Amino acid sequence: YYYDDYGFLDILDTSVANRLTYKRKTGYSQQAAAKTYLTGKRVYSLTNDDQFEIEALYYDRFGNHIASCTHNINGEYSYTYQKCDLSGTVLKSFAEYQTADGGSVTESAEHTYDHDSRLTRTRYTLNDTLVNTRYFQYDELGRLTRLSRNNGTTYASYEYDLQGNITSIKDVDFEQKLYYNTGDGIPRYNGKISSMKWLTPSIDNTDTITNGYSFAYDQQDRLVSAYSSSGKYGQERYTEEFTYDKQGNIAMLYRYGG
């Protein structure tokens, strides 16, 4: 590991050092001094001491990591850039991967936030082509309630209880419910999950399959059993039980069914 400056680049081949040296990218944060920060990493091959991957890391004047340049043992280079605001929040990022034969791939992401600094939109671009946009919605308590993907054509929704524990996740072909002091398990009032179930479509998409688990804990709140309650496979298939030693390590693990 290297810190404080970029003198380690001087011991590299000139061509490699030049390509790992920071070059400003328009629209992204500007490099500043890196005193006290990690500036480089060298990772050697386990089979050949002459082969290594080396990375240079760069920072802005607020100490935010804003760029990296990497050269690997295959002769490939990768470059990443970030634009950050004063608090260090990433507003946009860019990455380029260059192969040894001269090929390259670029990807970028732009992030939008609301007045409470919550992420509301991310736009992903691959080789200058927009490939996906994600939208994020929140409730009045700041909890994520909806995630829209694929430019808004698919989505997942989330529900919570009064304590802020997530209770439901619904996606296109998947639904999961988590129970704390309700459901089939022993009620838990400390945030531990007492049971859960999830629903998925059958292979031929003509039916909905329900699977589930009920959980039990010991007096130290360690998980001691997970009992399967699958409607398709029958009771206790994939059930697990745990025992612990005096130090809290798992001593025995039992699995049933399969």
Annotated model-derived regions:
Residues 2-4:
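Short, compositionally biased serine/threonine- and acidic-rich segments at solvent-exposed termini, linkers
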Residues 6-60, 65-258:
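Acidic/glycine-rich beta-solenoid
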